[in-house]
Design a protein with these regions (language model features):
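Tandem repeat scaffolds
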Residues: 5-10, 14-456, 464, 474, ...
Length: 478
């Protein structure tokens, strides 16, 4: 039972003065019925409020620092700007309680029901929230530094502008969560599920997002400076105008993600999946795409000079008219890719695979194709002055009207290549002529074989028609 004197005094304006004069007294309000009372600004520090009923009470600005609040009732209560620092609120039902601007630093709210509660602008730094249900809660503008979110339910929870610095959200599910303008600096979001989440303008400086899911998430204008997204899944995510300074995206799944006007320096996309990604307007400096899968990616007219594509795959990719002077494409797979009219001066394509690659009209001055396989590639009208094709395979390639002045062709394979009106390097004119002759002979032989087969099929059809007209030939007796 509550101390009658304490309970009676609490309802008067003299309460706070009494607390000052009796600082060593611990108010005993055990089981007190405070329902509907106006406790605005009351000094309740270190008070024993076990089993007290705060239903519909107004505790705006009240100070409950280190108060005992076990088994209390809060239905319909309002505690805007109240102080709950170092309080134990574990297992309480705080559904729809108004805590806007309240302070909960170092408080414990473990396994609480916080459904629909309003913590807008509240300070929950270092608060323990493990196992609580925050479904539908409002944490817009709240401070949640160093909070552990393990086991928390966050369905339809709003974190607009919340400060989640150094928060631990590893393995948390926040599918379609609302985090616009949130600050995740130094937070741990490893394996966190943020599929379809609103992360516009969010700050992920130094954030751990390894193996996290951001698929279909809206990350427009988000900042990922020094963030770790290795093995993260961000399929069809929106990274429009996002920043990626020193971001690690190694082995991340970025298929069909949008990078419109995105940028950053020292970005690592090594071994990442960038299938069908549009990077035309992206502006990355010193980006590393080593071993990345860029099949069917769109980079038309992009400036690739600061990039490295060692071992990358460009199968079916569009790189027409790109600026890639001096870029390293060694061991890359450019099969079926288009580099039409591209600037590839002094680019390194050594050891690359380029079956049916389109390099027509491209600028290949001083480019290195040593050991490259360019079978059936299109190099028409290419300017390959001084290019190195040592040990390269150009079988079936079309070299028509190209300029190979001073190019190197040591141990190069030309079988079936077409070199009509091509300008060969000194001493290689005969080789080009023979290549063209063999190509024409092969075409003629193939054409003759096709014509012969066509005649055979026609004769079979005629015989089949004649057989159909004749009466069936019967043998034997009935």
């Amino acid at each position: 039972m509550a101390n009658p004197e304490h309970w009676k005094l609490l309802s008067t304006p003299a309460w706070n003065d009494w607390r000052i004069k009796n600082a060593n007294v611990t108010p005993d309000l055990t089981g007190a019925d405070l329902a509907g009372m106006d406790l605005t600004g009351r000094d309740l520090k270190r008070s024993d409020l076990t089993r007290a009923d705060f239903s519909r009470a107004n505790l705006a600005g009240a100070d409950l620092t280190r108060a005992t609040l076990r088994n209390t009732k809060w239905e319909g209560a309002s505690a805007a700007g109240a102080i709950f620092e170092h309080c134990d609120l574990d297992f309480l039902d705080l559904t729809k309680v108004f805590f806007a601007g309240a302070r909960f630093r170092s408080a414990s709210l473990q396994s609480c029901t916080l459904v629909g509660a309003d913590f807008a602008g509240a300070d929950l730094s270092f608060t323990r929230l493990e196992g609580s249900d925050l479904s539908g809660a409002n944490l817009a503008g709240a401070t949640l530094k160093d909070v552990n979110f393990r086991g928390i339910k966050l369905s339809n929870t709003s974190f607009d502008g919340a400060d989640l610095s150094r928060a631990v959200m590893e393995g948390m599910s926040a599918v379609r969560g609302s985090f616009p303008n949130a600050n995740f600096t130094g937070a741990n979001l490893k394996t966190c599920d943020l599929t379809g989440a609103d992360l516009r303008r969010a700050k992920f400086t130094g954030t751990i997002l390894r193996q996290a899911s951001l698929s279909a998430a809206d990350c427009e204008r988000a900042e990922f400076t020094d963030a770790d997204l290795e093995l993260a899944s961000a399929v069809e995510a929106n990274f429009t105008a996002a920043g990626f300074d020193r971001t690690r995206l190694r082995k991340a799944d970025l298929r069909r993600a949008v990078f419109l006007d995105a940028g950053g320096s020292d970005v690592s996309f090594a071994e990442a999946k960038l299938t069908e990604v549009d990077l035309r307007s992206a502006k990355f400096e010193k980006a590393n795409f080593q071993g990345a899968d860029m099949s069917k990616a769109i980079l038309r007219r992009a400036n690739l000079k600061p990039y490295s594509f060692v071992g990358a795959s460009f199968s079916g990719a569009d790189l027409a008219e790109v600026q890639a002077e001096g870029v390293n494409f060694s061991r890359a797979d450019i099969s079926l890719g288009s580099f039409r009219l591209a600037n590839l001066k002094r680019a390194d394509f050594s050891g690359c695979r380029g079956f049916d690659a389109d390099l027509s009209g491209s600028l290949l001055i001083g480019a290195n194709f040593e050991g490259a396989v360019l079978q059936d590639a299109d190099l028409r009208f290419a300017r390959a002055i001084g290019a190195n094709f040592t040990g390269a395979e150009l079988k079936g390639a079309d070299l028509a009207n190209s300029d190979f002045t001073e190019a190197v062709f040591k141990k190069t394979k030309f079988w079936g290549a077409t070199a009509r009106r091509a300008k060969p390097p000194r001493g290689k004119g005969l080789l080009f002529s023979l290549s063209t002759t063999f190509s024409k002979a092969k075409e003629k032989k193939t054409k003759a074989a096709d014509e012969k087969e066509a005649k055979r099929q026609k004769r079979i059809a005629e015989l089949e028609a004649e057989a159909a007209k004749k009466a069936p030939h019967l043998t034997g007796r009935r």
